[in-house]
Structure formats: C-alpha cells, structure tokens
Amino acid sequence: TNDSIVDSLFRKAGIVCCHNRQELTTVCAIFMHPEVKGKNVAVITHAGGPAVMLTDVLSNGGMDVPHIEGPKADELLAKLFPGSSVGNPIDFLATGTAEQLGYIIDACENDFDNIDCMCVIFGSPGLFPNWEVYELLNEKMKTCKKPIFPILPSIINVKDEINDFINNKGRINFPEECIFGNALCKI
C-alpha cells in the first residue's frame, strides 16, 4: 500500500503516523501541551532565520502563519525595539527582552483572534543570561489558554537555564524548529 493512503486512513481515525523515533518523541511531546484548536500559528522569535525556516515548514505542512496587522499590532510594535516586526513571524531582535516577550505573548493571547497557538524560538544571542526569559515563558505557559511551544535551541551555551526549565519547571523543550514544525503539522 501507498504510505499516503495509510497516513490518510490513520489521520481519519485520529492516529498519528510517525516514521522514526525523533518524530515519535516530538509528536508525543506536543501531545503533552494543551490541544491546538486551529491551524493559525504565531511564530515568535528573536532570531529571524529559524523563524523563516519554521514558517516554511508550517506553511508547507498545512498550517497557517497569518499576517498580523491593525491598531493592536501597531500598539505591540511600539513596545518593541526599532527594527522589530510584528507581521508574523514576530521578530523582536537579538536584543529583545523578557518584558518584550511578555508583551508579545499577551497580544497573541488577548488581541489577535486569528492566532490559535504560539511557537516561541528563543536561544541565546550571547548578550545576557536567559533565566528571566525562560521564567517568563514558564509563567505564560501556566496562564495562557492558547498553547505555547518553547523552541530553545541554545542547548550548549544556556544549558543551565534549559536544564532548569525542563527539570525544575517540568517543561518540554523543542530544540530544533523544523523537526517541531513537521511534528505539529502531523497532529
């Protein structure tokens, strides 16, 4: 039988077909988060390249990364450093702060009805420790109704912060945006 036929039958039955262990563990980790109720994703980042790659994977996999605009988007942009973008992906630059990430998450949660979940890519630009950012991310994940998926790629240079996020806060990290994106599209 053709794999696409089997995948279609499984999808109709609510079964997610995975083709390797990495895909399986990533899909399982996504299931550990609140259910995504739609196909509209906000990609939030301080690193443009990974956001573009994730956006491409999501779009190619059937998810939408809708453009964000209007007065609420303008209000959010005014709270970010010059050069930032809120069009989606939302890029608040390598110098972006935990406070600014909080503004972005709050806007996606409360102001942008065309967003169903958030993917936050936050590594380490090497400018400052990430403790405050990961603490804020943990708190927002507790309070937001829309799922937030942390993509924390800097597993070497901020390993202590990521270990705390995983081991002490009980969170899951998706260290690679494209693997995460492909898994999210399967669900």
How does the language model describe each region?
Residues 1-66, 135-187:
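Peripheral docking tails and interdomain loops at the edges
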Residues 12, 89-92, 125, 168:
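Conserved short-loop catalytic and cofactor-binding motifs
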Residues 25, 101-105, 134:
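Short, well-ordered alpha-helical scaffold segments within catalytic/effector domains
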Residues 126-133:
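Glycine/threonine-rich flexible loop motifs
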Residues 123-125, 150:
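Short, glycine/charged-rich beta-strand-loop motifs at protein surfaces that mediate ligand recognition
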